């Protein structure tokens, strides 16, 4: 059902082992959305390749200061839509300067071809409401559809808004579920 990890400025980056665990538990596509403090813009990186994703994440760790960097990661388990890069979260609307990821299933959003329920919500519901009424109206829409899901948005200035109940670890990281933890029995599952 996917996982979102949110790191706000001042919180240390999640370690590589944690990110690897997220990817192993949710292997159907990966995204990293971060505020690039060097040029002041939000960047979105999406891939189907776990190793490419981890390499890109490590390069962000080396080139960005945890004290000033906001980011979120998303690892996908496909429930709607096929396994392809375009269905990886970190959906972007360039006119609104927003990136979006979702964890859960949006039961009230109808299937639209090969799109995920997340992309359908973002593109066909959220963006029109946001363009019309800003965050005030968008918050109302989110409350109406979120259920047990989790959402995260980042604007082009690196501001993060998140919705739903997240797990907060001792370091201040937020996770949408526990699939970032290596479970004690996982050793036996690797055949």
State each model region's role.
Residues 26-30, 66, 71-73, 84, ...:
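Short, basic and Ser/Thr-rich N-terminal targeting/leader segments
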Residues 2-6, 29-37, 73, 89-92, ...:
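Short beta-strand scaffold segments in enzyme catalytic cores
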Residues 52, 64-65, 69, 73-75, ...:
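Regulatory input/activation interfaces that engage signals or partners
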Residues 79-99, 141:
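Acidic loop->beta-strand submotif enriched in PP2C/PPM serine/threonine phosphatases
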Residues 1-57, 71, 166-191:
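Extreme N-terminus nucleophile/cap motif
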Residues 97-111:
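Conserved beta-strand-loop-short alpha-helix elements that form
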Residues 107-168:
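Short histidine
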Residues 14, 43, 80-83, 109-111, ...:
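Short helix/loop capping segments that flank catalytic or ligand/cofactor-binding pockets
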């Amino acid at each position: 059902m996917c996982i979102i990890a949110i790191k706000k400025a001042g919180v240390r980056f999640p370690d590589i082992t944690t990110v690897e665990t997220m990817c192993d538990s949710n292997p159907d596509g990966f995204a990293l959305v971060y505020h690039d403090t060097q040029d002041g813009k939000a960047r979105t990186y999406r891939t189907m390749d776990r190793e490419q994703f981890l390499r890109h994440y490590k390069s962000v760790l080396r080139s960005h200061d945890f004290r000033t960097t906001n980011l979120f990661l998303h690892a996908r388990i496909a429930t709607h839509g096929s396994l392809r890069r375009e269905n990886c979260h970190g959906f972007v609307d360039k006119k609104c300067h927003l990136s979006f990821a979702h964890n859960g299933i949006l039961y009230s959003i109808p299937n639209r071809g090969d799109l995920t329920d997340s992309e359908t919500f973002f593109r066909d519901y959220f963006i029109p409401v946001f363009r019309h009424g800003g965050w005030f109206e968008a918050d109302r829409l989110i409350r109406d559809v979120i259920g047990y899901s989790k959402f995260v948005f980042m604007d082009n200035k690196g501001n993060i808004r998140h919705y739903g109940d997240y797990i907060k670890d001792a370091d201040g990281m937020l996770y949408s579920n526990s699939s970032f933890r290596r479970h004690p029995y996982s050793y036996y599952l690797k055949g």
